[in-house]
Each structure stands twice: as C-alpha cells, then as structure tokens.
C-alpha cells in the first residue's frame, strides 16, 4: 500500500519519485477522492519567482528537475518543475516526449537547461528587439538578408529547444499547449515558406512577420498575465458589444429610412430664360448633370453644397436648383444609402469622430428638425455606451483587484510565520556574528569556527546586511573626509551664522517669492517683443540664477556637501543651478537654444512649498511604476499596429497616392513609413480616425482598412480605458501618502504667521489706542496660523484646501476612518452605505427621511456641526464650502424663516405691545403667509419660466416683428415689477438678515437687479450695453426648482475640493505653454495667396521680406495663424484645442511646418515636433484628467456616505420614487389575465402566453429587421416589389398575432400597455400600406411602414421577454435615470443661458469656418444647435475662428445688416474666448458627473454581489419566478419542480443544474403530496447564500414578517417529512431491496447472471448515493441551524 506523497521543500525529481507520483495519480483516479476543490497555488504559477519560504536554492538544484511544490500539480498532474538561478518557476510534463525522451534523458535535460537559462531568454528578447527595429525601417541596408536569415535561424533554434524540452502535443505544458507557441510557430513557418519558396505569395502574408513583435509579451510574465486579465475583460464586454451592435443596427435602419439618398442632393446650375441656347442644349445631354463644375461650391470647400427640399433645409443660391445628382460626400463614404454605410456613419457618430461635419451635412440635406436624431445618437446613445464600457471595465478591474487581495490575504499567514521563524533566529545569528567579529579583531586568536562559517542562515544574513549598503565602505570614508567640513572654529562659526540665515523662515518666504517672480518672468515672453522687454527678461534670468546659486552655496556651507545632497529637493535645486550656469556659458553657441526649455524645471521648485503639488507628483511617479506592465503593453500594441499598418498599406500609399492628392504627393497622415504610421495609430487612439480611414480605403480598399482600423480602435481603446481606470484607482489609493517632511514648508508657514501676527498687532494697537496687545489675542493668532507639521497631511486632505495649513484634530475619527476605507476602492463599502442587507434601498430612504426631519428640527445645531467639521481654519476652500452649504441648506428651512417672521426684529425695533407694533406684526404675518403659500410659489415659478422663455424671441428678426417686440417690452416691465414685489414681500416677511443670509435669495436679488438694469438700459443710448445682461435672468430658475438646487449643491460639493488639484493641472499646462512659446513663438506666420487662399511654396517665397516685396504688385498677405503660441495666453488656448481634439490637426500642421521667425513654413520640415504634442496629450491631458476625476469620485463617495448611500443628485421625493423604479425594473406590474373557460379560447390563450410563441415573435421581429437591411437607395424594380410584399407579409403576421391575442385576452387585451402599443403599430402599418395607393408614394414614402414595423423591436428590451443580458445592462442606466434627468435639466439651463448670451454677442458674426447657415447665433434654435455641438466637444474651434475675425482684412465693421440697426459682421475675440472656454469647462464638469453617476451604479451592483448580501430586488426576482411555477397562488410547489425552480432563479439565489444533491442537503420541510412551501424555500436559499453572517437572524425575521404582511392568509399544512429524510428513506429502501434480491439470487442460481447484470449497477449507485447523503447530512450547516 503506497502512502500519499506530500512535497516537503525542494526535492530532486528522480525515477523513484516519478513512479510514486504515477501510482498515486492512478490510485486517485480509481478511488473516490476528496480533493476536488484543490486548485493551483497562484504564487507557484509558471513564470513567477519561488517564494523564499521554500528556503535557499542550492547550486545542485539550479536547472535540475525537482518535484512539483504545488500540491495541485503534485497530486493531480504528472509534472515536475525546474528553477533557474533567478528562482523562476518552469513547469514541464513528466511523460516521455517523442515516444523516447523521458525527463531523465540527457538530450531533454540539456534542452531544459538551455530553455530555463536567463541568458537564453535575454538572447531571444534582444533578437526580437533587433527584429522590431529593422521592421520599423523603410530603407533597409544591403546586408538585410543576412540579418533576416540569422534571426530566422535563432527563432527556429528556439522552437526546436522548446519541442525537445516540452514535447509537441501530449500532456500538460506541451509546446502546442501554449497559444503563444502556436503564434510563434505559425509566423516562423510562414516566414520560411515566403522566403525560400519560388512562388510570389500574396503581399498580405508577408505582413505576418510583424506578429513577431507580440513575442515580447510571453517573454515578460507581467505582460502575459495582464493579457489574460484583458481577455477576461473582453469576455465580460461581450454583452455590451452585442447591445451596442443592437442599438447601432436600430439607429442605422432609422437613418436609412430618414436620410437614404438625401446626401446626393446638391445645388445644380440650371439655365435661366435669358441664357443662350447652347447651354439649353447641353442640359439635354445626360452627362451634363454628372459634370462637377455645374455644382455650386462654397469658397475653400472640396465638395458641392448640399441642399434639401424642406423649408428648414439648406437652400440654393439664385440660379441653382436642388437636384439629386453625383456621388455622396467624403469621397462617397458618407451616406445612408445602404445598411453597411449607415452602420458606418452611426458608429462614427457614437465614437464622436468628426461628428460636426456629418451633422451639418444631414441638416443641410434633410432639415433642422432631424437635430433630434443627432441629440439621441451623438449625446444620449454615445454617453450610454461609453458608460456601459466604463462600468463593465470598472467592475472587472475591481474584481481582479479583489481577487489579488484575497490571494495575498491567504498567503500572508505563511509569510508571517516564516518571518517569525527568522525573527526568532535573529538573536542567535547576532551572537554568532559578534563572536566572529571578536575573533577577527583579537590578536591572539587567528582561527575561526568552521561550524559557524558553514551556517547557511548566518551567511544569508550577512549577505542581506551587505546588500543594504549601497556603496562600498571606502566611499563612506571618502565622504566623511572630504564632504563633511568641520575645519577650524572660525569656519564652524561662519557655518552656524549661515545656517541661521539660510534656514530662517523669512529666507524661505523670500525664495518662494523669487520662484513665483521667476515663473512670472517666464510667462512674460511673447512675440513680437521689444528690446527693452527682452533686456529686462535677460537681466531677470541672471538675477534668478544668481539667487538660486547663492541659495545652493549657502546651503552647502550650512549643511556640508554630504548633508546637502542627502535631500532630494536639494539635488533638484543643484540641477537647476547647473543648468542655468551651463546655459549662460553656451548662450552664444549655435544649436543650444533648446537648453532654454529646461528653465521650465524651475516651476517644479514650487513643490517644495506646495504639498499638494508634491504629493500629486509622487502619486504620479508611483502610479507609473506600479502600472509599468500596462504602459509597456499599450506601447507594444501601438508599435505592432504601426509596423503592421506600414507593411500592409505602405506600398499602396506610394502606388495610389494620386487617388487622395491632386499633386500626387503623400499627405500628412499616411502609413508609408513607420513614424507616420505610428502617428496615425496614435491619432486613432485619440479618437480621430475617420479622415485617415477614407484615405486608406481610397488607396487600399475597404476589405483590409476597415478590419485594421476596427482592431486598433477596439483593442487600443480597451487598453487606454483600462489604463485610465488603473490610474484612477492608483491615485485613489495614493491619497493617503503623506508629504515628505521638509523645513521649507514649515518655515513658510511660520513666516506667514509672523507677518499676520505683526499686522494684527498693528491693527489692534491702532484700533484699541493702547500700547500693549492683549496676550490672549496674540496667543489666538499664533494658535491659528502656526501648525505642527505639514508632512502629516494626505492627498485627500490637501485636495480639500487651497491653503497649506491643516488642523489635524477637526474631523471625527469615525467618519474619517469610514471615508478612508471607502475611498480605497472605486466600489463604496457596503458596511458603510448599506446598514441592512435586505431592502437596502428602503432602509436608506427611511433613515434619510428621519435624518431630514431631525435636521429640520435642529437647524442651529447643524450649523454648529458645519463649523466644527471645517477641516482648516485657514483654508479658503473649506470656508467657501461651509458658506455654500449654509447658504443653500439654511435658506430652505421654512420653519426657520417663519420663526423669523414671528420675531419681527429685523425690520425695526417696534414694540409689539403698541398699536403700531401690532399692525406691523400683522403686516409681516400676512406677507409671510403670502410668500409661503404654495399657489404663490407656483405663480412665481410660472412667471420665472415665462420671463426666461421670452429671451428666446430676442433674435436678429425681432426688429422686423414689431408686435412681438412691443409685447416683449411690456412683458419685461411686468416681470420686473412682479419680482420686485416678491422681493419686497420677502423682505417684509423674513427681514433683511434672514433674506440676505440665504444664498438662493441673494441670487434672486441679483437677478432682480439685472431686470432693473435692463429696463434702465432701454431708456438711454449710452446705457444700451446693460441690456445684454439679460442672459443672467434664467439663473432665477435655479432657486425655484428643487431638482436643480440638488444638482448645484452636489456639483459644489464635488467640485470645490478639486480646486487645488485643478491649480496643479494648470501649472502643468503652464509648463507646456511656456515650452510652446519658446518653440513656436512667431513661427506660425505664412505668406498667403489671396486668390486661392493657400500658402505659397517655400521655394517661391522664402521669408517675410520676399512676401512683402510681392505686396506692391499683388495683395499678398503675411498672416499669422489664429491659433498660435506667440504668448502664454494664446498657448493656453491652443493647448485647450489640442486637449479637446478640436482644431488640433491645424495647430500641429503649423508647428510641424514651422522653420524660424519670419521664414516661410515648409512642409513637414520640423516633423519631430509631433513629440511635443504627444507628450502634452499624455502628461498634460490624460494624467491630469485622471487626477481630477479621482478627486471628484472621492468627494462623490464621501458625500454619498454622508447621505447614507443615496445618490447625491436626487431629491428626497426622488429617493422614494427610486424604490418604485427598482420595483418596476424587477417585476412585471401587469395583473395576470384569467384564462378563458371556452376551450378554443383557452387553447389560443395557452399558445399566445407560451414561451415558444414569444420566441417566434422575437424571431419574426429580427427577420423583419434583416429584411430592412437589404434595402438600398439604388435597386431594381423587382427588388422594390419584393421588399413591398415582404413588408406586407410582416404586417399580416403581426395582424394575426393581434387578432389571436384579442381572442385569448378578450377585454383584458387593452389593459396591457404593450398590447396597446402592438395594436397601434398594426393600425399604422395597415394605414401606411393603403395610403400610397390613394395619395401617392411621394406624400407617404415606403420607408414609413418599415419604420413603424421597426418600432416593435423595442420588445427585445422588455423584462422577461428579450435577452437577459440586455436587461442587466439597462438596469444601472434605468436606476440612475432620476439623477441623470436632474443633471440634464441643469445642462439645458446652462445651454439656454449661453444661447441667449451668444445671440446678444455673436448674432451678426461673418459666416466663415464653423459659422454657417446651420450653425450660427442668429436665432435661439440655431444657438442651441451650436451649443449642443460644443457640449460634445465638436467643432467649437471653427466657431471661435469665425469670432476671431475682428480686423478690417477679415470682416467689415460697417456692413449693413438688413432689418436691424446693428452694423458690422466682426467678432469679439476676448468675449469669444471667455464664452467657449467657460462653457466647455462647465459642460465637461457636468458630463463627467453624469458618467460617475452611471458607473457608480454599476459598482454598487458589483459591491452587493461581492458581499453576498440579498437586497429587496433579489426577493422580487424570487417571487417573480415563483409566479411561473405557482400560477394558482397556492404558496406550494411540487418537490419534482424544485430543481427547475432553483435553476430558473437569478444569482445569488441561483443554483445551476445538476442541483438535486444540494437541494436535498438543504433539508426542506415537505407537506402532504411532496409539496414544499414558498417561505421555507426562501429561508433555506437565503441561509445558503449568507452562510454564518451576523445579520442572518435579522434578515430571516424581516423575511418572515414581510411574507406575513404580504400574505395574511397563509395556507398552512403540517410538514410530514423533509427532503433529506425522504432521500434517506429512498436510499434505505434501495439497500433493503438489494439485500432481498441478493437473497433471492442465492436461492435461484439459474437466474443469477441476468439479474446480476441488471442490479449490479443499481447497487453501486445506491451505495454511492447513500454515502453522499450521509456525508451531506453531517456537513450541512443549514440543518444544524434549523
């Protein structure tokens, strides 16, 4: 009998151990083993380092076969491991390979040693990198074939080594068992065939060599495991991808029905009556309509002007008519003429790539009414899909993070135990070390103890001690001798004197002032700059270099060189000083101007005095280190995509370049060489891909370009989004990192405190007229401004303040711990946000209501709490937050205001006992009743909406509409008087103090002032600018509607704490802006040909002087680009366009072509300036965006915790409605229809209510959608007739369905909303089929019927009808819908205000660039169209370009605008910049919070699943399924249906089949007839999910009480047995039956063989079942609880 082998440490793998393992595995296969739950140990996976708990690795164990240390492989798999000298684990199959090579064969052992050797892996990695470098080269050297053959030989040798070491296929860990080896083998085979075959293969196959780049991934274990995680994420995203395709298909079909063929409508030149006869004759020629020169083109446009036949569509100029002719725009690739191109256009809209052009094209061709379609697709649908991807990825990331955390928790005890063992041996080791040292130093003893020297543990300890020393000992002696200056006493006195000066607080204050002044001097550089300014800046630079040099010298004297360079900030300061000195020395050397760029490093000196800056920089560096594998994987993918694109399309761009450029020159964006291909891939990842895809399809075709681009878009965006989530999580976990303790920050605080102390002293002395300031006052000043230490404050604290001081004893300890634990993860902690595991939504809302009542009753105490919870006495941001909270919350307490009315002390101290006093009190009470009356509030709300709505009529046509103008003037007067009256009533009711202490009333007061000023502005001509302040009137809406109040409060809470981080981000942008000024100032000027509007070639015009010399003959223009880097302000604006990817291509083109100041730009002469913009997008956009969103999410979670886990963007009423919404989402609210008694009707009822009938209807809907996809713009008459009859057939089928349901449901048919919807679809479909026969197909297009029928596809999203994955993905959106609607209301209000402001300021701007007939500010509707476009960050650069037309050469300031007195069409650049920048920031902030709301809903669901808590939703789902199994509401189901019922439930109550054993183990009570009660099943399933949870008893009691309330007449039947007992009885009966049969068999020998064959299997099965259920009974925890 063989013993079960157990691994003990590292044991050599021998033939004996091999036989032992084989016998053990064979035995476990034959026996009923108990180790089914055994899984591989994560720390012992292939490629990881062997943990140190397994001891040291002796020399004889390196590269030698060892017994597997993982119990899973040791007991279940026939494997062994091999370790290299780096302790890396390699696992091999122990079976013989190639039928002869056993693990002990010398050939196989040699190949294993080669394979595991670190040098072999390094050699392969170097070979791959060399191959990558040569694959990126366009012009290869002559010796390329030699190198390629050498690399091919290396890869072939590697494959042979792996084959001999691992085997080909059989067993675990074989060569072909690894997918990466499949890739490597396939690429090598392709390369051999292509290289040595005489045939010419397809060029595409030659690109297979680029797959070799991916070989970097398996050579790095971190990359390999990360790819596995991303593949797991992709699996979870499958449902999202399917739903995305579903919605894209629906919108594509709608687009086909609305816009098919419309984009071919163009303005065509049609001969007039007075034109010659020749032209009339030409129009009869069919080729005339195809000639492109007969179309109308706008100036500078490549494609003809689109038009439409609707009144709100684009109109043609005089002499042109709108006809359908020519091809579609954008080289024919933009259209809705077929399903494929419509899908392409919708995908482009969803990705929001260049949407403004498609948006304008459709509105020109079809009309502005279709703006609704774009709002739904570009904003709502795009937002929803992005939220889905982010939510699912966030869930996957958190699951992976939790999995790693659980693994580390399991392994931690082992490491702690090992650490204890090592710690116990420390004393003995130290004693032995001391003995050795004593013997070494003793002159008597020369021998050492051999047994001590041979101690392996002691040697290991000594090696660790040696490794801690960074430098050799002689370097420390050198530093002590030469770098520590303790010379003469005079030097020590001088050093002490310098130390006092340089370390004084005011010295640091002086230095920080110098740093700020230096930054200001850096920002003053501009172009053109006068000589005086240039001289001033140079002198300033010399002064600052001198100051920083003196600081360094004095600190070296005060601290010694050794102490000085021990501080990181001092090393950084010395680098800045050395750079400044080197720059001075090389100032006149040609080519050294780039040294000026390193001046930007001086800005980072602020981090020494700015803790937030310092901590964020540290968090950034730590995050990059932690995420190095993810960054490396992203770079590998970009490199591979660039090389693959270059190999696949490079030759096509060279051969077919004339297809995309009229001059047959390569465009800026192509893939002919590696660098341009790399830039193209980077542009795709930035979201700008459609224009380069058009060019690619022109030169290489659609079959290869579209798959390549889809691959880059999907995989690249997955990597970028995953990196973004990892950064957000990393920043969130780094927020507890404390700032480094430095004296400079403390000294700065002390200096500021002393200055304030002195100022207070002087003020007190002046005010009090005394000689001495009271000591208590001065002590208070010191206590406020002098803090202990800035280093103890975390990132989360520093993000909540603008000052550098922080009081550490202000916040409550409990709340702080809860917040810190919560913010460690993206998922809110359920222990904080959920107090009860069942019906958490209800309990939260109920508790919240109680809290609201308590807060209303104790308002004064709440204000005291606000003051106590202030995180810093000196923090301006915290003060602002507390004031906002007080003004917004305090003003809403009507009780507080009513108390103020009764007191009556704020409007005069009139005694209430006098007659006048009583009259005054009665007046105030009356006013209070009026303003508190609900009807008065509704009236004021209505007047507010009317006064806001009237602003929409004040457009450029108002002067032509005299009646409307007069009505609006009277309305303004009435509204003004009403609001003044309301203000006076509230003054009388509440008093001045109460009124002006409320923030909303202060806002109302400001709006009333605006009303008054606008009326005053109409009276005097010089006061007319006051009228434009009307745009502030809609702000009053905020104070009238609770939903907007809630959103504004939430935005203030989540946004104000980010100001400090926002300032840090601005500093990063400032660095890039100053760099841009140094690189590009004055270099964006170019000589423009006025006739063509294009730039002159540099070969014709070399510089500015040449251009000006041509100016005398022709009107040549030496113009500057509107977006430039001539100063820091322009640099910020240009960087904002790059950050929003609007106009960034134009800016980069100007930078790439720039040569020097006053030199004509040349095409791509400075191409590597792309690196500047790439670095800005990474370090100036991506990373700061991650930091900002991290802080916003942290504050979102903090305030959500304060509200008990409720959403901070919904009102109290909406929180109650939230429960109802969840109930609607989880259950079907319709009442069941009774089954008819008639047999025929009953049969039809059973048919239409069956699941099969529902499936058939869904299939019909899908087939009908597929039939619509066949339709095209240009198709044969036969196809049109066939599609007509197909639509008719579907209409008949849906009519039959409607008739069958009418027969089955009778009058109950119309009680179901979905049936009414289907009935209306049938009616409209029949009408749509019949109308064309009477009124013609022009008035009723055939697509109308198709769109009506398509509306039925919404059934796919129904709960319980469509796919379950759709419901799960729609759930978070629907649950967050109330909050989203509130936020959308605020967005609409912001758009309304900005639309009115735009009409007042930009209505008459010249139509150019982004301002055209569709997008302009002439009317309110057009302004809203523009602002919607800007809200999705599309095309605002073009609008700003048009507004920048303020010079006489660009616009006409005296132009007469018909119908109005306004003159000119010039813009106002400063107002335009403020307008667009502010709107972009506000809309970005609001939209980011929209994303956070939906993503947090996803994570809340994930949090509940993770913690195995059962919510009310889970129980609703349970009873919903129960209705299907118990339609008669008996509260019982048959035990035979229990298995199906458990499998039909949703997780976590779900039990997958086979589940009979688990159900029997639950030991459920059974009544007569083998029936089981609903409550018993629910309780048992709940206990199975929650286990031994401490909340179990409370949950059970709530379930029982809730069930009794819902079912007061419980049908009770006494249980007669249980499921476990019934199974035991059945097993016992089987055993008795088997014994009796055996007895009969022994007596009847003739029938033994036949009966034995029948019953033998039954005996074995019964025995196993009996053993299983005996074991289940012993182990069942639920049975013991019952």
From Swiss-Prot:
The keyword GTP-binding does not apply. CDD domains: Na_channel_gate. Residues 804-819 have a biased composition (Basic and acidic residues). Its main location: membrane. It is found in: Cell membrane. Residues 820-834 have a biased composition (Polar residues). It is a multi-pass membrane protein. GO terms for cellular component: glial cell projection; plasma membrane; voltage-gated sodium channel complex. III repeats lie at residues 916-1224. It catalyses: Na(+)(in) = Na(+)(out). Belongs to the sodium channel (TC 1.A.1.10) family. SCN7A subfamily. The sequence contains 4 internal repeats, each with 5 hydrophobic segments (S1, S2, S3, S5, S6) and one positively charged segment (S4). Segments S4 are probably the voltage-sensors and are characterized by a series of positively charged amino acids at every third position. This is Sodium channel protein type 7 subunit alpha. It comes from Homo sapiens (Human). The gene is SCN7A.
